[in-house]
Amino acid sequence: MIKFKLAAISAVLMLTLMYSCDYEFIEPPYIEPPQGLSFSEDIIPIFDASCNTSGCHVQGHFAVDLTPENAFSSLFAKDMIDVATPTESRLYVKLNDGNGTHSSRSTAEQRAYILQWIEEGALDN
């Protein structure tokens, strides 16, 4: 009888914990990027917020160094940008793969900014 009560209490506790830990991520509203994006003013802040933090894409760690002083040259040296077909740029594809941490670390708005910057010629401005 004691085992039954203990099992029942455990089951109720587990169900309570399972259903009380629900988190719904709310995606911020999409804002159309402005024309004439600047690499230093519009793209670098995206990398600073989500890519080159916690030792991810910093100098000496991963293939692409996205720190402000090295990001532009690293993106082109590692063939991450394709201005002829922007949606096939390795950077854009990586951000939209849906399988890894890359897509979860950026918003739809940030990905749209990066795509537009590539479409505008991926200038170092």
What are these regions (language model features)?
Residues 21-125:
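Aromatic- and Gly/Pro-enriched helix-to-coil junctions and flexible linker segments
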Residues 1-21:
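Sec-dependent bacterial lipoprotein signal peptides
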